[in-house]
């Protein structure tokens, strides 16, 4: 059984992320060859946070992804199902309203947020369609969703090289810098098995979102999907 074939049981995935929380941001920088910071900047530009907006940052981990929204003056709620991640985040940013929550049963009222966003976490939720509907539920009419997730490179020769990198280079790199390298083997397998850009767009539409669009980053290694709640 591969780690990605755990059927993404929440307790299994949460336990993996608990184990990597302390060095999570450093490890991401290493295995992404520094691209993770560029991707976060692209998310911040897409969210375009404004003062007094309410933003849900789902799968926020240690809330590194939340900081650009905070600096823009928005009220940001970092939410994650890994208590280990939340603990590290709270130590770093004690003023933030860290919230434990499952993406399939968000602990928020209907139509709470102006924008909802999730970066590199949608793959880890057991039922993607349920999660997209939950994000829709807690978004105000006219509000937006921004999803940053690993995807499929658009150039076939590069896709082949990228797949080799996922399965052969990430595990040893993770062993060098992570306290739980098995979590990054799971990461590689879950990326390989994840739907491509059009497939995720179709799931967004099925969940009720409108004006669905995406932009490829790093040649499609990552895709930034955007949509609006009518």
From Swiss-Prot:
CDD domains: AdoMet_MTases (cd02440). Keywords: Menaquinone biosynthesis, Methyltransferase, S-adenosyl-L-methionine, Transferase. One of its GO terms (biological process) is methylation. Transmembrane segments: none annotated. It is an enzyme of class 2 (transferase). S-adenosyl-L-methionine binds at residues 62, 80, 102-103, 119. Signal peptide: none annotated. Its EC number is 2.1.1.163. It catalyses: a 2-demethylmenaquinol + S-adenosyl-L-methionine = a menaquinol + S-adenosyl-L-homocysteine + H(+). InterPro entries: SAM-dependent_MTases_sf, UbiE/COQ5_MeTrFase, UbiE/COQ5_MeTrFase_CS. Belongs to the class I-like SAM-binding methyltransferase superfamily. MenG/UbiE family. Methyltransferase required for the conversion of demethylmenaquinol (DMKH2) to menaquinol (MKH2). This is Demethylmenaquinone methyltransferase. It comes from Streptomyces griseus subsp. griseus (strain JCM 4626 / CBS 651.72 / NBRC 13350 / KCC S-0626 / ISP 5235).
